[in-house]
UniProtKB/Swiss-Prot annotation:
Residues modified to N6-(pyridoxal phosphate)lysine: 250
Cofactor requirements of the protein: pyridoxal 5'-phosphate
Binding site residues for substrate: 15, 42, 109, 132, 188, 293, 389
Binding partners and assembly: Homodimer.
Residues binding pyridoxal 5'-phosphate: 72, 108-109, 132, 188, 219, 247-249, 258, 293
Catalyzed reactions: (2S,6S)-2,6-diaminopimelate + 2-oxoglutarate = (S)-2,3,4,5-tetrahydrodipicolinate + L-glutamate + H2O + H(+)
Name of the protein in its database record: LL-diaminopimelate aminotransferase
Pathway assignment: Amino-acid biosynthesis; L-lysine biosynthesis via DAP pathway; LL-2,6-diaminopimelate from (S)-tetrahydrodipicolinate (aminotransferase route): step 1/1
Organism from which the protein derives: Bacteroides fragilis (strain YCH46)
Enzyme Commission number(s): 2.6.1.83
GO BP field: lysine biosynthetic process via diaminopimelate, diaminopimelate-aminotransferase pathway
Amino acid sequence: MALVNEHFLKLPGSYLFSDIAKKVNTFKITHPKRDIIRLGIGDVTRPLPKACIEAMHKAVEEMTSAETFRGYGPEQGYDFLIEAIIKNDYAPRGIHLSPTEVFVNDGAKSDTGNIGDILRHDNSVGVTDPIYPVYIDSNVMCGRAGVLDTESGKWSNVTYMPCTAENHFIPAIPEKRIDIVYLCYPNNPTGTTLTKAELKKWVDYALANDTLILFDAAYEAYIREPDIPHSIYEIKGAKKCAIEFRSFSKTAGFTGVRCGYTVVPKELTAATLEGERIPLNRLWNRRQCTKFNGTSYITQRAAEAIYTPEGKEQIQETINYYMTNARIMKEGLESTGLKVYGGVNAPYLWVKTPNGTSSWRFFDQMLYEANVVGTPGVGFGPSGEGYIRLTAFGERDDCIEAMRRIKNRL
């Protein structure tokens, strides 16, 4: 008899965004003539950069000829893309990487969810709270998260580090030792950031406690202020304690194309029970060769085009578009008296609900009264209660109209 992985049965009945979709669909059935503006899920709306489209067309044409046809590619990614990544994303910041330290993937979500494959199931886990749900759910699936306390919404083997207005959304360094810590900066969902000095405290903690930092830098392209690190490897010693995840989804509109990459430094190691130090780069490479057949050649050529002069210019135009949306939304919400965080170095706005209203209650008010969809903050963790997340990835006119509705109807 085949037995199931019973850890999956511990997961909530559905994913956060599935719950939102059900509520929105119910509303649409009962209010078919209402025009809904979606500012909840972080999907993009601007088209792919022209440079990427042209590169994809060229790559498709190559597939029509036996001389230039490409079949299976390297599981780690093609050299042309890896070299472009190192040259453009790391070398200008004084970060030196070997090509074998970069692994191209089909989006950061895959690797942030799968990285646990190379780590023991009983490692302790620390997360900032609120947090991207994938970090928690992927640890639940392998049994690492422990048991859920339904009253608090917390898992027994997870240390939650609250990020609230009271601590300026800066997580406190844990007093106890934690094996694995997830950090995402610029942060999803709060849109806030850490300075280099603040991030250095985490690197120092990790080095002192033999802690592995899993650093999600998917939104680094949106950073505007000078003292905000784009990579954890800007901090001395980080290569000995951190894995970094990057994505082209929000940088270049690749949410439907699917491409990103993970950096696993060769000097990063973890221990066996006997105390032997094992390079995580070697384990991750072995895992990828077994479970991943590589990102498509056509997709990787499109990603390479991001780093051309034309690609860089076109991507910056798109990022500026979304960040202008963020400014318009932030100003619009603040004009109604709402307290808004984020939206300066990230395309997310973290809105405090008025008068102590719960996250889901305010979600319903926005949906039914303003016909605007956000994401309830409590869906990102216990410290998200009393907040709602809005994204700046919508069309400009929709963002303006949504602010008008919120101001006039709520």
